[in-house]
Amino acid sequence: MLLDEIKRMSYDELKRLAEDIRKRITEVVLKNGGHLASNLGTIELTLALYRVFDPREDAIIWDTGHQAYTHKILTGRDDLFHTIRTFGGLSGFVTRRESPLDWFGTGHAGTSIAAGLGFEKAFELLGEKRHVVVVIGDGALTSGMALEALNQLKNLNSKMKIILNDNGMSISPNVGGLAYHLSKLRTSPIYLKGKKVLKKVLEKTEIGFEVEEEMKYLRDSLKGMIQGTNFFESLGLKYFGPFDGHNIELLEKVFKRIRDYDYSSVVHVVTKKGKGFTAAEENPTKYHSASPSGKPKMLSYSELLGHTLSRVAREDKKIVAITAAMADGTGLSIFQKEHPDRFFDLGITEQTCVTFGAALGLHGMKPVVAIYSTFLQRAYDQIIHDVALQNAPVLFAIDRSGVVGEDGPTHHGLFDINYLLPVPNMKIISPSSPEEFVNSLYTVLKHLDGPVAIRYPKESFYGEVESLLENMKEIDLGWKILKRGREAAIIATGTILNEVLKIPLDVTVVNALTVKPLDTAVLKEIARDHDLIITVEEAMKIGGFGSFVAQRLQEMGWQGKIVNLGVEDLFVPHGGRKELLSMLGLDSEGLTKTVLTYIKARSREGKV
């Protein structure tokens, strides 16, 4: 295992290994897709860390999990690294299902410090002597959960070592007061001068030489520069740094010094996101998550959101857009360029984004809160308490709904229908096509008078933005019967409708644009004409759209058979969208087999 080999290597050998790993990560990610820039920035950091701490004994927790590719390579997964993010291959994130050295599964930002506290307390109660190390960066420290946990370190007498991987970025550039504070620390002329002095000292020392005085110089210099207590020290933590995150020898010495300290320490490490790959260094936001190379350029729903909002906002000055550190990912960077004064990136603060939007809406604005489905889960209380309870006019643009593919179970948007359905005042819209998406946005923004959620997939498509926007119009947000048949009625919501339309059977097909409220008039018509109704949704089946329809049919006194098709009670793995839909039985082939089975069964009962 490379984990053992690196401890015997010279620093020159480690530098060569770092470049080999950098080349390997770049080649694999450009082929498979994945988080490129973040991982290129943490290679030397990981090598130095694992020369001092051992993940077989010490709990090393990687926040968010997308910066841990080197960790995977070092911990016995080098031979499988080429399979990362492919169906049946390695996950793109840290997961306990993959290795016992992945101490805590991650995918969402800001969880590591709280998890570290939990492990530390468990070790203490069980009498186990282990270190707890947290590596947090890419903006995760700005999340509320991370700050809450930081505030508990002193209270719980923690000895945790926190490695702050500061690359000045999350997915987009960091924002907020803490980001500004860290920027001041790493750009101080005193720090830069101290860094040069330390480099010269290290060049003259033997490898085993203690660097106490030099470290003290840096620490005292930084304290003088700040003119008082810095943010971390105000919480009772010991702060060290900032240090060059690409200097293995320096980092190893620092980690050795703090390893056995009996108090919580923050080691501030400055890294270059995308280091070693020019394109990623120059545009780390674009290469935060790279798509597989060689694919033709297509238009995404996210980009379409940005273009649509930008166009509508030219006439409607009340439209504002809000995102949580994902301006590019959500397509709102397009809106930002045209309407910078009405764009708000609040960092990794989903809860704050929702409440911020609620207040804007209550005072006459039309806020659009664009957040990935999986991350909106983090603001559920705010959706209920701050938005829905007050009937605040907020449009939730829920990106990445449904099966998202290679990012896997931490990122699939399969719960949004289920957690939004029971919320009073909430309307839920699930368009089936780009045209329907644009027209739904336009219609909702024209008449926004309460909370509305529009959910849409990660899918891309061939299409012209101008053509879609030129034909933008208000539409009826009800259901439509697209095809009439005799053997059964299928009601589908969202883009999964496109799979349903491929079913080669004599069935009625209904496009359920609105998940809530249900179109009772169309539902009654379908119930009158059919004894077998099948619902299809790209979401969790339990408590979802199908359950809602079944409940309404029961209330109507309908005596037929209803079948709900969706995602069963499981966490969907990572893989290509087509592969996953096939696995779930939600592609056209799987749906055809299932529908035919129920038609035949109903026929044997003499009901069809």
From Swiss-Prot:
Where Mg(2+) is bound, by residue?
D138, N167
Write the Enzyme Commission number(s) for this entry.
Answer: 2.2.1.7
SUPFAM superfamilies reported for this sequence: Thiamin diphosphate-binding fold (THDP-binding), TK C-terminal domain-like
Catalytic activity from the UniProt record:
D-glyceraldehyde 3-phosphate + pyruvate + H(+) = 1-deoxy-D-xylulose 5-phosphate + CO2
Q: How is the cofactor bound?
A: Binds 1 Mg(2+) ion per subunit. Binds 1 thiamine pyrophosphate per subunit.
User: Mind listing the GO molecular function terms for this protein?
Assistant: 1-deoxy-D-xylulose-5-phosphate synthase activity; magnesium ion binding; thiamine pyrophosphate binding
- Pathway as given in its UniProt record: Metabolic intermediate biosynthesis; 1-deoxy-D-xylulose 5-phosphate biosynthesis; 1-deoxy-D-xylulose 5-phosphate from D-glyceraldehyde 3-phosphate and pyruvate: step 1/1
**Coiled-coil region:** none
PROSITE patterns from the entry?
TRANSKETOLASE_1
| Sites where the protein binds thiamine diphosphate | H66, G107, H108, A109, G139, A140, N167, F277, E350
Q: Which cofactor does it need?
A: Mg(2+); thiamine diphosphate
Which InterPro entries does the UniProt entry name for this protein?
Dxylulose-5-P_synthase (IPR005477), THDP-binding (IPR029061), Transketo_C/PFOR_II (IPR009014), Transketolase-like_Pyr-bd (IPR005475), Transketolase_C (IPR033248), Transketolase_CS (IPR049557)
Q: What does this protein do?
A: Catalyzes the acyloin condensation reaction between C atoms 2 and 3 of pyruvate and glyceraldehyde 3-phosphate to yield 1-deoxy-D-xylulose-5-phosphate (DXP).
HAMAP family tied to this protein: DXP_synth (MF_00315)
The similarity comment for this entry is: Belongs to the transketolase family. DXPS subfamily.
UniProt name for this protein: 1-deoxy-D-xylulose-5-phosphate synthase
Origin species: Thermotoga maritima (strain ATCC 43589 / DSM 3109 / JCM 10099 / NBRC 100826 / MSB8)
Name the gene for this chain.
dxs
